[in-house]
């Protein structure tokens, strides 16, 4: 079972529907106590960085999410859910993120229409399990005004460009994030969600064999 975190800032039902369509059971989690019942989680999100962190704090999600990330189980952030994985966001002042990945979330420079909205290509920087079966320069759907700035090359799996190059798929170990919306990016976004579902199933199988 894949859990989708409900903190009042995400496109929950479309992600849930996409996973079920792909054959991967999913449920929306309304409280941290439900984390124990799932083998992987997705943190969606739309809106402002500061509002998202405030909502996560208000609903008691922050420490449970950090603990879950450290447990080694698959964790995927989508759009704003990817951005809050990082250390600091600069939207409406400087705000602390979850700190699971190194970097800052900054505004696109002037000169381009903001938000960056629509289809854009993903240039694959390195192989990763989420990109298995997806061609280089495949198109994905984006909606965002801020982007991640990180000097940690190791976490950059895919890049896109909107006046400046920006990380579109990031991660290491079990914590990953997609700046685009895979649930709106058929067919390749659904392939990425399928790869995540396979990873969750494989990880759960390995864990059950160990126990």
Curated annotation (Swiss-Prot):
Keywords associated with the record: Amino-acid biosynthesis, Cytoplasm, Glutamine amidotransferase, Histidine biosynthesis, Hydrolase, Lyase
Main location (coarse class): cytoplasm
Gene Ontology terms describing biological process: L-histidine biosynthetic process
Any single Gene Ontology cellular-component annotation: cytoplasm
Compartments where located: Cytoplasm
PROSITE patterns: GATASE_TYPE_1
Active site: residue positions: 79 (nucleophile), 181, 183
Any one Gene Ontology molecular-function term assigned to this protein's record: imidazoleglycerol-phosphate synthase activity
Disulphide-bonded residues: none
Residue ranges crossing the lipid bilayer per the database entry: none
Pathway assigned to this chain's UniProt record: Amino-acid biosynthesis; L-histidine biosynthesis; L-histidine from 5-phospho-alpha-D-ribose 1-diphosphate: step 5/9
PANTHER family (alphabetical): IMIDAZOLE GLYCEROL PHOSPHATE SYNTHASE SUBUNIT HISH (PTHR42701:SF1)
Subunit structure: Heterodimer of HisH and HisF.
Free-text function comment from the UniProt entry: IGPS catalyzes the conversion of PRFAR and glutamine to IGP, AICAR and glutamate. The HisH subunit catalyzes the hydrolysis of glutamine to glutamate and ammonia as part of the synthesis of IGP and AICAR. The resulting ammonia molecule is channeled to the active site of HisF.
HAMAP family reported for this sequence: HisH
Protein name: Imidazole glycerol phosphate synthase subunit HisH
Naturally occurring in which organism (per UniProt): Desulfitobacterium hafniense (strain Y51)
Encoding gene (name): hisH
């Amino acid at each position: 079972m894949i859990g989708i975190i409900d903190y009042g800032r995400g496109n929950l039902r479309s992600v849930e529907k996409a996973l079920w369509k792909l054959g991967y059971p999913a449920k929306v989690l309304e409280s941290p106590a439900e984390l124990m019942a799932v083998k992987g989680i997705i943190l969606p999100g739309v809106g402002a960085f500061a509002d998202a962190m405030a909502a996560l704090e208000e609903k008691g999600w922050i420490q449970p999410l950090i603990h879950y990330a450290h447990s080694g189980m698959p964790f995927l952030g989508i759009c704003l859910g990817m951005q809050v994985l990082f250390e600091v966001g600069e939207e409406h002042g400087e705000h602390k993120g979850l700190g699971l990945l190194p970097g800052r979330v900054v505004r696109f420079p002037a000169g381009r229409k903001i938000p960056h909205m629509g289809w854009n290509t993903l240039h694959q920087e390195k192989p990763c399990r989420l990109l298995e079966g997806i061609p280089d320069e495949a198109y994905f759907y984006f909606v965002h005004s801020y982007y991640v700035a990180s000097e940690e090359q190791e976490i950059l799996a895919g890049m896109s460009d909107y006046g400046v190059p920006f990380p579109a798929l990031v991660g290491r170990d079990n914590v990953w994030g997609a700046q685009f919306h895979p649930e709106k990016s058929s067919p390749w976004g659904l392939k990425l969600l399928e790869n995540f579902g396979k990873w969750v199933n494989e990880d759960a199988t390995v864990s059950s064999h160990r126990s």
